[in-house]
Amino acid sequence: MSSPELPSQMGVPNGHTKLQEVTPDTPLDEVFQKWEEDGGVIIKGILAPAQVTQLREELQPLLDTFQRGSTTDIEPLKRFHGSQTKRAGGLTNCSAIFRDYLLDNDFLHAIAARCFGSGGRPGVHAYWISSANTINVGPGQPAQVLHRDLGNYPHYHLLGPDGPESQATFLIATTDFTDANGATRIIPGSQKWPFNQTWNPSQSIPSEMHAGDCLLFGGKVVHGTGANTTNAERGCVAFTFCANHLTPEEAHPHIVDINIVRKLSERAQRSLGFRSQYPRGAPGLWMEGYNEVATRLGLDSK
């Protein structure tokens, strides 16, 4: 006769009541120290005010074509996506600010290379973009259920809190984030909990920040969009890198205009999946035969 299963234990936050802040000039060692302490860190001033304004203007025609809520018939997914939330993808096609200042941002790529590196070496060729979309939360949107993003990749879940990160997400605020308008909430320190531990929404804190700032977090931390109790929309671009042996959320090679891709840097092309992938120790993934897929696409002059 087997013994009864013990109930899950409630996790305990690390006691921080506000997320720590860095800037694009902060040394990576300090960025990662703060990120590893809380599971999330605010990067101040990723975009300048004029860039935020232009980004909003470039995204508005796209947002005008999207309905609020989800197109799925699956009720739990509808609630997860948010009935008053606009999630629009394909940002590379419609925004020069996204292409020039986020997709090809040296600081964001430096963070990704370190996050997905191994053996003390940066993983310059170890990641690509999982998704890039808006999460624009309208008035009256209830709080999202708290969750961990690594649920997309079950084998990473099996590795537990000591396993590597499957993804790194940058939430770039296009409006101010406040507690009242639905700032993304994080339970600080929850990325270190055993994954069978439970939590309570009251343990979460809001990632309050200004437009142009960015929230960085990984796949292991417990988080979720807050409730928008105001009369104004809370806007952001959610930009996620994942290890490039994993399937991305967004199928960029089927979405992004090849004529736009031709004008991008090799790094940006690789990040979007228009070049083959070379994680450390691999002879190549995402190939055409055993050849670089970019050559087949006419992106190389060789």
From Swiss-Prot:
GO terms for molecular function: dioxygenase activity; metal ion binding. Pfam families: PhyH. Keywords: Dioxygenase, Iron, Metal-binding, Oxidoreductase. Its EC number is 1.14.11.-. It comes from the Eukaryota. Fe cation binds at H147, D149, H223. Residues 1-22 are annotated as: Disordered. Pathway: Mycotoxin biosynthesis. Its cofactor is Fe cation. InterPro entries: Phytyl_CoA_dOase-like. It is an enzyme of class 1 (oxidoreductase). Belongs to the PhyH family. Homodimer. Dioxygenase; part of the gene cluster that mediates the biosynthesis of the host-selective toxins (HSTs) AAL-toxins, sphinganine-analog mycotoxins responsible for Alternaria stem canker on tomato by the tomato pathotype. ALT1 also selectively transfers methyl groups at the first and the third cycle of chain elongation for AAL toxin. Gene clusters encoding host-selective toxins (HSTs) are localized on conditionally dispensable chromosomes (CDCs), also called supernumerary chromosomes, where they are present in multiple copies. The CDCs are not essential for saprophytic growth but controls host-selective pathogenicity. This is Dioxygenase ALT11. It comes from Alternaria alternata.
